[in-house]
Amino acid sequence: MSRFDTLFAQLQAKNEGAFVPFVTLCDPDFDRSFDIICTLADNGADALELGFPFSDPLLDGPVIQAANNRALNAGCSTEKSFRLLAKVRSKYPEIPISLLLCANLIYAQTLDKFYQRCAEAGVDAVLVADIPLLACKDYVTAAKKHGIQPVFICPPNADEKTVAGVASHTEGYTYLVSRAGVTSAENQSHAANLDTLVERLKAHNAAPILQGFGIARPEQVKQALTLGTSGAISGSATVKIIEKNLDNHPACLQELARFTREMKAATHV
């Protein structure tokens, strides 16, 4: 069983959901990013979703765009991102790690080489944000060749064909987007049909569903679980804490620890 499969089986046995924070690798720099990721893992994060910094991200709102820029300005490269991933995996051999990135970063290395490097660094799953289902075949093939689980986004306006396609291609977990638009902790509105989408995904035997976009408070984690999901992903709210404490690293780690504990506590059904 993969790390994600093992995690969801363990959580189900305990009647718990998953809390998965997202941060950008090397934000605000390599060493502080490692401390930040360790703080998340040590304070209850069930899995980690980590972003490769990119200068022109499609789905990212201003908070995560700023994180990308900080990492790039600190000299972060794909090379350094893989080094940081390997360091995290070495310290945390059990925690599931998913990568979120844009296709251009993969093209720079070729599909096969990129997924090989993911496997070597201990990555479990990869979500390529800008690859539609219609163009996913080569990515899925390369991922599976190297034991990486391909993850796809189910948008709130998904028709039946899209729901079926996401369910059939996604492994590890299914990323259910709360609403249309870009990531944001401020925009916490959710599409009205999410409960129906969850039912439709489950009818197609989709991988466990994690809801993302606009998840910033413990009660929203509880709401996600009430819909029938297996947990929630929080990106902008997590990254905002980093942004707020750029000049005070100890305070940043302290606030991230408290935030993670509170969000995780909300997953106890």
Swiss-Prot record:
EC numbers for this chain: 4.2.1.20
Record's signal peptide: none
InterPro entries: Aldolase_TIM (IPR013785), RibuloseP-bd_barrel (IPR011060), Trp_synthase_alpha_AS (IPR018204), Trp_synthase_suA (IPR002028)
Gene Ontology terms for molecular function: tryptophan synthase activity
Keywords: Amino-acid biosynthesis, Aromatic amino acid biosynthesis, Lyase, Tryptophan biosynthesis
Catalytic residues in the record: E49, D60
Recorded catalytic activity of this chain's protein: (1S,2R)-1-C-(indol-3-yl)glycerol 3-phosphate + L-serine = D-glyceraldehyde 3-phosphate + L-tryptophan + H2O
GO cellular component, one term: cytosol
Enzyme class, spelled out: lyase
Pathway: Amino-acid biosynthesis; L-tryptophan biosynthesis; L-tryptophan from chorismate: step 5/5
Statement: the UniProt record of this protein carries the keyword DNA-binding: no
Matches recorded under PANTHER family: TRYPTOPHAN SYNTHASE ALPHA CHAIN, CHLOROPLASTIC (PTHR43406:SF1), TRYPTOPHAN SYNTHASE, ALPHA CHAIN (PTHR43406)
Subunit note: Tetramer of two alpha and two beta chains.
Entries under HAMAP family matching the protein: Trp_synth_alpha
Protein's job: The alpha subunit is responsible for the aldol cleavage of indoleglycerol phosphate to indole and glyceraldehyde 3-phosphate.
Homology family: Belongs to the TrpA family.
Designated name of the protein: Tryptophan synthase alpha chain
Gene name as annotated: trpA
